[in-house]
């Protein structure tokens, strides 16, 4: 058993002691329930941990992570997380966060057989196909990778918006709002891509409307 593994439990002990020293009831209150305002959908990369980069405390962020922060509506795992967060936790914000130097995005741009990863990365290859003209015009390979990371976040945000539970709650309560972020590993900063949530709603509702209502007008006339 490696020393680094044992350190985990030592670190946990110190963390517990520090929390109890700050607030003796911390874990008693934490165990009761959770009321996060945020659903964070991010990459599984070990360098991009949600709570740390957001400066969030336990109970403040509901987190789902996978390779390259993909939201595939045929994937029961991601759709179940989103539906639970929207309908039961009543989150107000859904954040899709990618990061530069993403291995999953780079793998999707590599012409090779990656076995079981192939169907997963196909979602990102589809993003490239949708934006091929723009991406192919970027001569610098690293900048092209960075741009694909951003476009992947954008398209995954759209996949979130396509879900019926997101549409229905937005009409009723004006939430959740979907945001697209990129975490820059080179600087440690979060970049808000400032995705226009309402414009996307308006642009895609003719095809992806699952509620029978005009999303934007229903909200404005309440």
Label for each model-derived stretch:
Residues 41-43, 65, 95-99, 179-184:
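Short beta-strand segments
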Residues 19-60:
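N-terminal short beta-loop-beta anion/metal-coordinating cradle
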Residues 45-47, 99-104:
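Gly/Ser/Thr-rich loops at beta-strand to alpha-helix junctions
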Residues 1-36, 68-92, 103-222:
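Divalent-metal-activated hydrolytic enzyme cores
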């Amino acid at each position: 058993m490696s020393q680094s593994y044992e350190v985990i439990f030592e670190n946990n002990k110190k963390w517990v002691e520090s929390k109890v020293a700050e607030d003796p009831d911390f874990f008693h209150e934490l165990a009761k329930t959770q009321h996060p305002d945020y659903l964070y959908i991010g990459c599984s990369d070990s360098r991009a941990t949600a709570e740390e980069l957001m400066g969030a405390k336990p109970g403040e962020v509901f987190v789902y992570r996978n390779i390259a922060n993909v939201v595939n509506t045929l994937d029961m795992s991601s759709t179940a997380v989103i539906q639970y967060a929207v309908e039961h936790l009543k989150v107000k914000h859904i954040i899709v966060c990618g990061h530069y130097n993403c291995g999953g995005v780079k793998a999707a741009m590599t012409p090779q057989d990656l076995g079981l990863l192939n169907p997963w990365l196909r979602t990102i290859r589809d993003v490239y196909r949708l934006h091929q003209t723009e991406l192919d015009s970027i001569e610098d390979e690293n900048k092209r990778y960075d741009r694909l990371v951003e476009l992947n976040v954008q398209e995954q945000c759209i996949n979130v918006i396509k879900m019926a539970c997101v549409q229905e709650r937005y009409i009723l309560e004006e939430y959740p709002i979907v945001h697209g972020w990129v975490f820059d590993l080179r600087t440690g900063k979060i970049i808000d891509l400032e995705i226009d949530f309402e414009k996307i709603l308006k642009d895609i509702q003719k095809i992806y409307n699952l509620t029978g209502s005009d999303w934007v007008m229903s909200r404005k006339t309440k």
